[in-house]
Every structure is written in structure tokens, then in C-alpha cells.
Curated annotation (Swiss-Prot):
The gene is sfrA. [4Fe-4S] cluster 1 binds at H94, C98, C101, C107. It holds the Pfam family Fer2_4. CDD domains: fer2. GO terms for biological process: anaerobic respiration; ATP synthesis coupled electron transport. GO terms for molecular function: 2 iron, 2 sulfur cluster binding; 4 iron, 4 sulfur cluster binding; metal ion binding; molybdopterin cofactor binding; NADH dehydrogenase (ubiquinone) activity; oxidoreductase activity, acting on NAD(P)H. Residues 1-78 form the 2Fe-2S ferredoxin-type domain. This is NADPH-Fe(3+) oxidoreductase subunit alpha. Not regulated by FAD or FMN. It is found in: Cytoplasm; Cell inner membrane. Residues 78-117 form the 4Fe-4S His(Cys)3-ligated-type domain. It is a peripheral membrane protein. It comes from Geobacter sulfurreducens (strain ATCC 51573 / DSM 12127 / PCA).
Length: 844
């Protein structure tokens, strides 16, 4: 610790502390321009100059560490003159085009000039106009306005890890530009725009939309991935025109392309604006009446079991709660499910059985403090970018060892100490081999295992027959790499284990169990550094299941419906309902006559899409409640146009149990209505009971019936349960090598889109407008396929065509295609068994 005096006030701080940070602890504000708390200091602007007794020149407070016994002065006439001159010199080369600059009203340079009293200009220069970069997608760069603070470069390199821009040239010719001088080719997260203190970097979609004070700012939650970033909608005249995030938020103001630019789906001209009945526009009374009458008739003729419904991770907790209440209480059916059946529901069941948790073992900020990170079967860049930022922070700021296990090269590889690029279908074998390597080398967390695990010997015995060398060869890695990976993650305190779609898709839980075994022997669930983190692409997947949108449990994962029967005053279905695939089979067999789709499009988004399409054609009643005219909506008998996240109040629950409120920024598009409002009216028409009048009232009902949500108020809260300790039972699983097929297709997410939602966003489509198929150069050469050429994939009777993208990111024999695009619809090639499928590939 170091003791010093600042402006006559004594303070003791850690020796690595800067003068700027020490002053802040005393409540003393030192002006800055180039300093940004979340990145390393640059010391470029020198506005933070301070005097230190005994030092013959002013020092920059942002990057000068404290020393014992020094006396610092932050405010004096001398410092005021210095700071004013610094500002005047900056303005010599600044165009002063404030009237037409998009940063006007929120420009740090303007504010600094005003705050420091820089009201005159004694200097002059002949300005050489520099070329404005209009050729970048989504972002415009005007180097004439740049003050060379380098905040954009620091954010790009240190937080995003993209390394797309840099400082180029020297002296008066210095500018910030792309690394190769070509148009910007990056992740288009816009974090550089947010960091820019002037109008050098601006959002092209927001350009000339208005001055910042003309917009209403509404704090909310990002509606895309399960990271749950906090955002602000900026709206005017009923339109959301911008999304930002403050650095004081849980996500430190960092967003991805979807969070910052994906908002344009809200304003899509393709939005459903009016109810429809049998393909014709109708008013709400007609649509509601048609749906209610048809549901009553089907229940009367065929029983309540003839009705089913799919909920959605895109809608709020309140919406999902009301949906399952409508199905169970008003209709009398337990046939309720969602896309969680495609993997996350089975994973959650294992987490609950083995650890007593419904999601992550702790909040995701614990990743920042991890000493080792293991990422398995997950492209964090695409599935949860906000979590990827935290892994990068752990690796670069905390020197955490990073091990990846993924079928493809992913962005995190540049930060990784080890990358186990395994063959498709061999996840469980790979994890078992890694676990055995940890145990063989004695790198398990012995203290945690001794205190908490009851059957470590069972796991050791189960792995006795596993040859690490044979497993390595079968999975496509080397024994040396496997053992090196074990040493990187083993023997550490504070291990974070993260896993995603490659492990969860299809609901085969062996790989998940194997990974939890590994996480436990590493002690990953102990303490507040590291943890166990399942990852899902869509924001409210955990809340969806917490609210009881599942055939086998009520809200709060309760299997006894007595509490809900008393609260709702209805006899509820005694047996578990049909799950997703049983519902589809029921439609095919004719026992399920009606299907209600809330915020989902199974034809475009689920595996076996063509089979599902044919099944939906057999229904007597298909109700679709959605903001967009997807494939299922085109087939619907009744369409209810609904709201998106920016048009409603409610809550989302993140994968790590943060229940966060979202606030209504604008009214629903056209004649669309909020989901909860639609559901409560239909409930009223079916039962005659009075309507619930607000999402807040729904949350109150949830809090009264679901113990985990009892402490969650209308402003949110955290429901993360601590994993069980003591008596934990490992779940040994066996695995054999999977030879695979000559060509395997992996279907997954990409950074630039989220589900099908962002395919309605013109901003996202500007970057990636259509689907494609990644193919290894060797495979492309064998088939005579050129970059950009047409490729045809076949699985059974289903055929899909797409554009070839030749890349060594995929291994030979493996193809990758993004799941988002309805026109290409590679999901139709998949079966219910997972996200990979053997395919035949040919030049189209």
C-alpha cells in the first residue's frame, strides 16, 4: 500500500493505483479526454495534467502511478492555463463543424472546452482536409474531427479483441484507420463509436436522425442473447432510432452488433400490423372471436388434449407465464413446450439433478476473475458475445489460461493457450479423456473433491479403460495437446467452464454430464471466481422454463400443480403433457387439432422444418402470435400481430439468474398489441374471468406462486441459486469413438445475427444479407467448388442450396452453415438429434 496527499487530503491505496483513480476515491475530479476506465491509459491528451511537489513538470494523472509520500495538486491557476492551452491546440486542427456534427450535444470535446474555459483561440493553422470514410458499413469515419485519443483503438484491441483499426502514419499525418487501409472489416459492434469523444466515428443509421436531447431515452435489456446486456433505447416520433449502453452498466457499456445495430428490426416495414383470419386482414374483435370460438369447439369435440402450444425465449417472463396459464387453466391442456426441447431443457434437467441449479452456477462477472477458462462446444463470439468479452478480459487482464474445444477455428483461438479441434460427435470421448488426464496428473482440486464429492472413485473406475492416446487419435487431437490442456486448467483455483450449442443440441446429455464431472473435479463451482456456465443463443431461455413453459413442470419447476389449482381456481391436467416432438407426432396422427405458436416459427427455426410444415398443414386451427410474417404465419388460420421487446414492459431472466426489467420505449407497430395483452383478452374470452391489467400484476402473481421469484421486485433481482455442496455425485458416462461420415454439416449461429429476428433488420443484413456454406479448401478443390459458387447439400429427401465460403476455419470433411436465414433454411436438414448431420455435398 502507498500513502500520498492529493489537494491536502491524505489517502492510502494499492501501489498500482494511478493518481487519477486515487483522486476519484477522494471525490476529486480531474478532467480527462483520452482516459476510459475500462481500457489501459494512453496519456495522449494531457488534459489530466497535475502538479507533484518536487517534480519540475506537470504529470498526466491517468497513467502516472502513485508513490509513497508524494503531494499532488489537481487544481491551480497554472494547471488551468495549461489545460486551456491544450484545448486551444486541439482546436487548431479541429474543423468546428458542430452545427452538422452528429456528436453535437454529447461531444466530450465540446464539454471539455466549456468546462475548462477554453473560450478563445490564439493559434492558427492551414487545415488539410482528410478523406472521410463513407465506404465503411454502418460506421462513418471523419479523421478531420479526430483528436487522436486512441480510445477507439483501445476498445477494439483490448475489449473486443478484433484488431481492426490502428494508429497509422506519424506527426501531422497521423490518423486512425483500418489495419490495411481497406474498408472496415470487423464485428461492427459499434463500441468504437460509443468510445469516440467527438464525431469522428458515428453510426451511419443514426446520422442526421436528430440531436440527442430530442430523443426519449428508455433503459431496458437487450433482447438477443442470454448475456442480458443493459441498454438504452433512443426514440422519437414512435421510432427507435438508436441503442446505446452506459459504461456504468453490468456489461460496462459493451455491446455486439445485434445489441447496438439490431434495433432496426423494430422499424421493419415487413412487420405484421393487423390481425388476420384465414389470410385476410381483420379487426381484433373478429380475430379474437374466431380464435376463441374455434378453440372451444375443438375442446368440446376432441378434448383439451387436442390443443397444444409452443412458447418462446424471445418474449418476457410475464408473457410466457400467461401463455402456459392460458393453455393449462383456460384450455385444460399440458401440451406446452418450446425450442428448449432442442437441447437446453435436457441440459437444465441435468444441472438440477447434479448441482441443484437451473442455469449458471454464479453470475457471469465471475469469469472476469477466473485463473483458467475452459470453453467447450461453443462459439462465444456468436452465441454470447458479451460473455466472450469477459473471457478476453480474463485472458488478457488476469492472465487466465484459456483452453478451447471446438470443431471449428473460432475467434477466441487468438487468445487461447490450447485449441482442441475435435471431430464431430466425439465431445463426450474428448471430455472423458481430458478428465482422465487431469486425474492422472493429480491436478484435480483435492480440497474441493474431498469436501464435496461422494463418488470420485466411481469416476476413476469408469475412466480406467479410457486410453488417452486412443481417445486423442479418435477425436482428432494429439495426446500431447490433451495433456497440455489438462495442465492448463488443472491445479487452479477459479476455473470457469463454459459450454454451448455443440454440447446441448439434440438433448443428448452424456457430454453435458461428462463436462459437469470435469468441472466438479476442477472445483469450478466453488467460490466467486470462475464457475459453470451453459450458453444459449436467445435471451430468455431460462425464464421460459422458470415460467413453466414445459410439459413436465409448472412455473418454478414445480411438478405438483396443487398450488396453481388453488390460485387459478381450476382443475389442471394431472399427467405431463406432450413435448415438442410428441406434439408434432400428434398432429401427424390427427390427435392434435390445434396449435398456438407464441413468438416462434418452428418451420424456419426448428430441425425437420419440412416435416413440421407438412404437419401444420393438417391442423384445424393454427394460431400464430408474432411480430413478423414468418413461414408459420403464412399458414395460420388466425394471426395476432404482437410487440417486440422495445414495445413492452416485463422481465427477462438471464442464464445466470439476473431478472432484469425491460421498459416500453415505443408503442407497438401499427395495430399490433403487447403479448400479455393479447393473452389476457383471449383468457377472458375463454373463461369469462376478469383480465389482468399490467405486466407488473403478472409478475406479482409469479412472485406469489414461485418461491425463487418471491424476492424479485418490479425493478428486478437475482435468483442465482448456489450449487449444492457436500455429497455431490458425479455421473460417469461411457463414450466410444464416432467415425462420422465423409461429410458432416454443422448448423449454428454467427455473430452478425440472432435467430431469425435480425434477418428483419436492415442493419444486420447490410453485413451478412444471406446464408452461406463454409467449406474447407481441400474439400472445395476436390469438388471443383469456387469461392462464391453454388453448393447443394442433401440429407435424406431434403435439399438446400447456398453460396460457398472457402475457409480453413472448418476442418476437412466438416461444413458449417448459419441457422438464421429463412430462404436457405439449413435447419430443415437437421434431425431432432443435434446440430450436426451427415450430408451429401455437390456443386450446384
Amino acid at each position: 500500500m502507498v500513502s500520498l496527499t492529493i489537494d491536502g487530503k491524505d489517502i492510502t491505496v494499492a501501489k498500482e493505483t494511478t493518481i487519477l483513480d486515487a483522486a476519484a476515491l477522494l471525490g476529486i475530479t480531474i478532467p480527462t479526454l483520452c482516459w476510459l476506465k475500462k481500457v489501459s491509459p494512453t496519456g495522449a491528451c494531457r488534459v489530466c495534467a497535475v502538479e507533484i511537489e518536487g517534480v519540475d513538470r506537470p504529470m498526466t494523472a491517468c497513467n502516472t502511478p502513485v508513490k509513497d509520500g508524494i503531494k499532488v495538486t489537481t487544481q491551480s491557476e497554472k494547471l488551468s492555463r495549461i489545460r486551456q492551452k491544450i484545448m486551444e491546440l486541439m482546436l487548431v486542427n479541429h474543423p468546428l463543424d458542430c452545427p452538422v456534427c452528429d456528436a453535437g450535444g454529447e461531444c466530450d470535446l465540446q464539454n471539455a472546452c466549456y468546462g475548462l474555459g477554453a473560450a478563445k483561440q490564439e493559434y492558427g493553422a492551414v487545415l488539410e482536409r482528410r478523406k472521410i470514410r463513407y465506404d465503411w458499413p454502418l460506421i462513418e469515419s471523419d479523421p478531420n474531427r479526430c483528436i487522436l485519443c486512441e480510445k477507439c483503438v483501445k476498445v477494439d484491441h483490448e475489449i473486443v479483441g478484433c484488431n481492426a483499426i490502428r494508429v497509422v502514419n506519424r506527426g501531422e499525418a497521423t490518423i486512425i484507420d483500418t489495419v490495411d487501409g481497406n474498408p472496415l472489416n470487423c464485428e461492427f459492434c459499434g463500441n468504437c463509436v460509443a468510445a469516440c469523444p467527438t464525431g469522428t466515428l458515428i453510426s451511419k443509421p443514426f446520422k442526421f436522425r436528430g440531436r440527442p436531447w430530442a430523443f426519449t431515452t428508455t433503459p431496458s435489456v437487450c433482447p438477443f442473447c442470454a448475456t442480458g446486456c443493459q441498454i438504452e433505447y433512443h426514440s422519437r416520433n414512435g421510432r427507435v432510432e438508436r441503442v446505446t449502453s452506459d459504461d456504468s452498466t453490468y456489461n460496462s457499456g459493451n455491446l455486439c452488433i445485434n445489441g447496438r445495430f439490431g434495433y432496426s428490426y423494430i422499424n421493419s416495414p415487413d412487420r405484421l400490423a393487423e390481425p388476420m383470419v384465414k389470410g385476410q386482414k381483420a379487426d381484433w374483435n373478429t380475430a379474437m372471436g374466431t380464435a376463441a370460438t374455434a378453440l372451444k369447439q375443438i375442446v368440446a369435440s376432441h378434448g383439451a388434449d387436442a390443443v397444444a402450444g409452443f412458447g418462446s425465449p424471445r418474449v418476457t417472463n410475464e408473457d410466457n407465464y400467461l401463455f402456459q396459464k392460458l393453455m393449462r387453466s383456460a384450455i385444460g391442456t399440458g401440451n406446452i413446450d418450446s425450442e428448449a426441447r432442442l437441447g437446453f431443457a435436457a441440459t437444465q434437467k441435468v444441472l438440477r439433478e447434479m448441482l441443484g441449479i437451473a442455469g449458471a452456477s454464479t453470475t457471469i462477472d465471475a469469469i472476469d476473475r477466473a485463473t483458467a477458462v475452459l470453453v467447450v462446444g461453443c462459439d462465444l463470439n456468436a452465441e454470447a458475445t458479451g460473455m466472450e468479452y469477459r473471457v478476453i478480459k480474463a485472458a488478457t487482464k488476469n492472465n487466465a489460461k484459456l483452453v478451447l474445444a471446438a470443431m471449428r477455428d473460432i475467434k477466441l483461438k487468438k487468445f487461447a493457450n490450447s485449441h482442441l479441434k475435435y471431430r464431430p460427435g466425439n465431445e463426450t470421448l474428448l471430455i472423458n479423456a481430458l478428465t482422465k488426464a487431469v486425474l492422472e496428473e493429480g491436478l484435480e482440486n483435492k480440497e474441493f473433491c474431498s469436501a464435496n464429492i461422494s463418488n470420485l472413485s466411481d469416476l476413476t473406475a469408469a475412466l480406467a479403460g479410457v486410453s488417452i492416446a486412443d481417445a486423442a487419435a479418435a477425436t482428432g487431437v494429439t495426446e500431447a495437446d490433451l495433456r497440455a490442456a489438462a495442465r492448463l486448467v488443472g491445479g487452479k483455483k477459479g476455473v470457469a467452464v463454459i459450454f454451448g450449442a455443440e454440447l446441448m443440441r439434440g438433448g443428448n446429455t452424456d457430454a453435458v454430464k461428462a463436462l459437469i464431472n470435469l468441472a466438479l473435479i476442477l472445483g469450478a463451482t466453488a467460490g466467486d471466481t470462475g464457475g459453470l456456465f451453459p450458453v444459449y443463443e436467445k435471451t430468455n431461455i431460462r425464464g421460459l422454463l422458470d415460467m413453466g413453459v414445459a410439459p413436465d413442470h409448472f412455473p418454478g419447476h414445480q411438478t405438483d400443480g396443487t398450488t396453481f389449482e388453488k390460485a387459478w381456481g381450476k382443475k389442471l391436467p394431472a399427467a405431463a403433457g406432450k413435448d415438442l416432438w410428441q406434439i408434432i407426432e400428434g398432429i401427424e396422427q390427427g390427435s392434435v387439432k390445434a396449435l398456438y405458436l407464441l413468438g416462434c416459427d418452428p418451420v424456419a427455426s426448428f430441425p425437420e422444418g419440412e416435416r413440421i410444415r407438412k404437419a401444420l398443414e393438417k391442423l384445424e386451427l393454427l394460431i400464430v402470435q408474432d411480430p413478423f410474417p414468418g413461414e408459420a404465419a403464412k399458414m395460420a388460420h388466425v394471426v395476432f400481430p404482437s410487440s417486440v421487446a422495445a414495445e413492452k414492459n416485463g422481465t427477462f431472466t438471464t442464464i445466470d439468474g439476473r431478472v432484469q426489467p425491460l421498459a416500453k420505449a415505443v408503442a407497438p407497430s401499427g395495430d399490433a398489441r403487447e403479448d400479455w395483452d393479447i393473452l389476457t383478452e383471449l383468457y377472458n374470452r375463454l373463461t369469462g374471468e376478469s383480465r389482468i391489467h399490467s405486466p407488473a400484476a403478472v409478475l406479482d402473481e409469479v412472485a406469489a406462486l414461485v418461491p425463487a421469484y418471491a424476492s424479485v421486485g418490479r425493478t428486478g433481482g437475482t435468483i442465482t441459486a448456489q450449487p449444492r455442496s457436500g455429497g455431490l455425485a458425479l455421473a460417469p458416462v461411457s463414450a466410444r469413438a464416432v467415425a462420422g461420415s465423409p461429410t458432416t454439416l454443422l448448423v449454428g449461429t454467427i455473430l452478425y445475427h440472432s435467430g431469425t429476428t435480425t434477418t428483419w433488420s436492415k442493419n444486420n443484413l447490410e453485413i451478412i444479407p444471406k446464408g452461406y456454406i463454409e467449406i474447407h479448401p481441400n474439400d472445395a478443390a476436390k469438388l471443383g467448388i469456387a469461392e462464391g459458387g453454388k453448393v447443394r447439400l442433401s440429407a435424406g429427401s431434403v435439399k438446400v442450396e447456398g453460396t460457398a465460403k472457402i475457409t480453413p476455419r472448418v476442418q476437412p470433411g466438416l461444413l458449417f452453415a448459419p441457422s438464421h436465414f429463412r430462404g436457405m433454411n439449413v435447419n430443415a436438414l437437421l434431425s431432432r438429434d443435434g446440430g450436426v448431420v451427415p450430408v451429401t455435398v455437390e456443386k450446384a
